[in-house]
Amino acid sequence: MVREEVAGSTQTLQWKCVESRVDSKRLYYGRFILSPLRKGQADTVGIALRRALLGEIEGTCITRAKFGSVPHEYSTIAGIEESVQEILLNLKEIVLRSNLYGVRDASICVKGPRYITAQDIILPPSVEIVDTAQPIANLTEPIDFCIDLQIKRDRGYQTELRKNYQDGSYPIDAVSMPVRNVNYSIFSCGNGNEKHEILFLEIWTNGSLTPKEALYEASRNLIDLFLPFLHAEEEGTSFEENKNRFTPPLFTFQKRLTNLKKNKKGIPLNCIFIDQLELTSRTYNCLKRANIHTLLDLLSKTEEDLMRIDSFRMEDRKHIWDTLEKHLPIDLLKNKLSF
């Protein structure tokens, strides 16, 4: 972290992207600015965002590979230049982009002699490869080579104990960290009592999402983390009665719509987050797991889409409908919702 004195002016708190570039298919860079901040606030925001970006962003990667009857990961397979361990390490480096949840199956099935790259992986429709040229193995002889793969979306670094799997299935230490590095610097501006701080935030990603997308997701995760503190505890209500209850923010969905109507503006559905809906914790968590963050995301889903969400029930569907019906114009619901 670097501190410098620079000239600046006091204005409403705002952020913007001051630099964005693509260094390669697996290296994106973005530089953002947030200002003006009071003294000490830049450190608070910078530390929180850096931790959230490095540890809370979800990524998709290959977590398991099955070769068939292979006694151990240091084995070699006739007609293949690389050992099983080297192939596993190459699979670990494959960068995937998806919105899937749970475990999905993929496979590789080719005939040599030829080079195997990430382009040869047969993936589910919801998954795509960031860099199709990433190497996997080199077949030096005319052999049939097949691998069954498992793909999972998670966060952080996951390890599994190594065993001699009789069926030839081997775990891959999953690195579900789309953000490769984060750095922030703080610049001071102004004089005397008018001194403010400017926060510069640099983000590098692996190409599975852009730095702007990573910043958005990290910010949403931090907001979700602090939501319980935004609502004052109801007087006379015991902890036991509230411990399983989702607490909405102070600025509720209803209040947001009322303000918009007073200002005679259209309703920006992509700016209303599901955090502001009066949803139960169960329904809210189901939607978040399905990457439904805004009202626009929700209204773009059909009933079939919602019912395919893990743990989503008919009661959740009815609860969502009742909430929207209470606050949204009925013609908007008919146009947007198919259930």
UniProtKB/Swiss-Prot annotation:
Give this protein's Gene Ontology molecular function annotations: DNA binding; DNA-directed RNA polymerase activity; protein dimerization activity
GO CC annotation: what is one? chloroplast
Q: Which SUPFAM superfamilies match?
A: C-terminal domain of RNA polymerase alpha subunit, Insert subdomain of RNA polymerase alpha subunit, RBP11-like subunits of RNA polymerase
What EC number(s) are associated with this protein in UniProt? 2.7.7.6
- Which region ranges are annotated with the description Alpha N-terminal domain (alpha-NTD)? 1-233
> Where does it primarily localize?
plastid
Q: Which reaction does it catalyse?
A: RNA(n) + a ribonucleoside 5'-triphosphate = RNA(n+1) + diphosphate
Q: Where in the cell is it found?
A: Plastid, Chloroplast
> Would the keyword Nucleotidyltransferase turn up in this protein's UniProt record?
yes
Give the UniProt keywords, A-Z: Chloroplast, DNA-directed RNA polymerase, Nucleotidyltransferase, Plastid, Transcription, Transferase
> What does the entry's free-text domain comment contain?
The N-terminal domain is essential for RNAP assembly and basal transcription, whereas the C-terminal domain is involved in interaction with transcriptional regulators and with upstream promoter elements.
NCBIfam families named in the record? rpoA
* Function in brief: DNA-dependent RNA polymerase catalyzes the transcription of DNA into RNA using the four ribonucleoside triphosphates as substrates.
Output this protein's name.
DNA-directed RNA polymerase subunit alpha
* Gene name, Swiss-Prot/TrEMBL: rpoA
